[in-house]
Amino acid sequence: MTKFVFVTGGVVSSLGKGIASASLAAILESRGLKVTLIKLDPYINVDPGTMSPFQHGEVFVTDDGAETDLDLGHYERFIETRMNRANNFTTGKIYQSVLEKERRGDYLGKTVQVIPHVTNEIQEFIQRGAGMGTPVAVDVAIVEIGGTVGDIESLPFLEAVRQMSLRMGANNSTFVHLTYLPWIATAGELKTKPTQHTVQKLREIGIQADALLCRADRRIPGEERAKISLFTNVPEWGVISMWDVDIIYKVPRMLHEQGLDGLICDKLRLNTRPTNLQRWDDLVYATEHPQGAVTVAMVGKYVDLSDSYKSVNEALRHAGMRNHVRVQIDHVDSETIDSADAAARLARYDAILVPGGFGQRGVEGKIATARYAREHKLPYLGICLGMQVATIEYARHVAGLANANSTEFDPATPHPVIALITEWQDADGSIQQRDQDSNLGGTMRLGAQSSDVLAGTLAHRIYGDVVTERHRHRYEANVNYLEPLRKAGLVIAALTQREQLTEIVELPQSMHPWFIGVQFHPEFKSTPWNGHPLFNSFIAAAKARHQARHEGPA
């Protein structure tokens, strides 16, 4: 039978429930348990696909094409289990499902209410995410409830998991509550009162935490832990200190050394092998002992919030570990770059990356960036929109297609080298159609799709014959312009197996040492253990350029 760990949060948001949940999952996985994670988001959006990155951070895409919370990226980077659309759902998704059932008459004329209909639906979604009753059922499902205890939006989720825990029995579920202890500099002490109040709020709705993860900017002394235990009815060994660390991969060791996994296994009566976190220790050591450094300019439009590019940032760091260098990432606002000052802004970097994005703002700065990288032989990786701007730049300045553009930015362009594809086939074989007036939510090419890679290319050296990567985009390279671009020297290095859509473009090695644009999002499949072959190669090229410029090791 699947056991459940419910993770809640209090006092303030952004305490790191996702990292804490993923770290606990990693520890339990090291004990030989099959683990998954489920994220419950209290907002009314059906999914985060149409939300601004400035509000929500990046949208993480799964193999099956779900647009999900960025915490699922943490989950996949910390454990072996791959996420899918069942691992993340929102209030909007729940209400959508309930209303569809009501319209079908599934409730047999009853008055549809939050209790029991909405709370029952939440429980069904949780069980589905854990694979209960199926061959893919897991030993432990860690359920992270978004938001903060006390928020009205989270109440149906908290009530649902309270009911679920009661029904399952004491040894089949447990509650872990993440809280915050502020340091008051003028008083010179940590304050426990907010933690006391948030646990009290949790108890008011019928939930007693079995463990408290106490976030602070420093270790919590034993005296404060004893005080918290007394006022929250949590045993002192269940009051876990979670202080700020410089590397998130230190968190599993931190939690294990304070006995969190032992407490969970005892509560759930799980007999496991001993914990082995050696690979996490090795990972931290590799991170802390690089043999050099490279600096990468990430030129985008959402640079004011680094979480907008969370997976890209992590993929670059993973590749740094594989190449034994520390990767310094400078986020550069593309609106601040034009052709006249590109050299002044970009010359000092070892490599340039242009990530995905939507909308016209900052696009000309990205095009200028791609041109500078091409003309100055600076390693360039363009992801999604980054591939499209590289294609536009090449069309304008090499292929002689004046004013070439994407119809996303200029519907009247004389040379729409990037355009909206109106019909395509999903991973499940179903035909999808869209146009300029289609709904924005859920209408993109999404999820994992396979492409054939052209032999003899840089992409082939990196990937081999076939590449399978995740997608999230609405516009494509226009097939009508592929031949003129090829004749001008642009290499179309990979095409989708079904629709023959452009997936990878690159410059020939005779023209540029490392210049690749990809329509997909490779960052979603990078892990700290292996990195990702494309990012690994990109950082290797950055390292080689750094060594050539400085005539010594990076």
Swiss-Prot record:
Ligand binding (L-glutamine): G357, L385, G386, M387, Q388, E408, R474
Cysteines joined through disulfide linkages: none
Residues annotated as binding UTP: S13, K191, T192, K193, P194, T195, Q196, K227
Pathway(s) per entry: Pyrimidine metabolism; CTP biosynthesis via de novo pathway; CTP from UDP: step 2/2
SUPFAM superfamilies: Class I glutamine amidotransferase-like, P-loop containing nucleoside triphosphate hydrolases
GO terms under biological process: 'de novo' CTP biosynthetic process; pyrimidine nucleobase biosynthetic process
Residues the record lists as binding Mg(2+): D71, E144
Active site: C384, H521, E523
UniProt binding sites for CTP: S13, D151, I152, E153, K191, T192, K193, P194, T195, Q196, K227
Assigned keywords, A-Z: ATP-binding, Glutamine amidotransferase, Ligase, Magnesium, Metal-binding, Nucleotide-binding, Pyrimidine biosynthesis
Keyword Magnesium: yes
Region entry Amidoligase domain, spans: 1-270
A Pfam family hit: GATase
InterPro entries according to UniProt: Class_I_gatase-like, CTP_synthase, CTP_synthase_N, GATASE, GATase1_CTP_Synthase, P-loop_NTPase
Reactions the enzyme catalyzes: UTP + L-glutamine + ATP + H2O = CTP + L-glutamate + ADP + phosphate + 2 H(+); L-glutamine + H2O = L-glutamate + NH4(+); UTP + NH4(+) + ATP = CTP + ADP + phosphate + 2 H(+)
Keyword Chaperone: no
Residues binding ATP: S14, L15, G16, K17, G18, I19, D71
All copies of domain Glutamine amidotransferase type-1, residue ranges: 295-548
Miscellaneous: CTPSs have evolved a hybrid strategy for distinguishing between UTP and CTP. The overlapping regions of the product feedback inhibitory and substrate sites recognize a common feature in both compounds, the triphosphate moiety. To differentiate isosteric substrate and product pyrimidine rings, an additional pocket far from the expected kinase/ligase catalytic site, specifically recognizes the cytosine and ribose portions of the product inhibitor.
Family stated for the protein in its record: Belongs to the CTP synthase family.
Subunit structure: Homotetramer.
Name this protein carries in UniProt: CTP synthase
Organism: Verminephrobacter eiseniae (strain EF01-2)
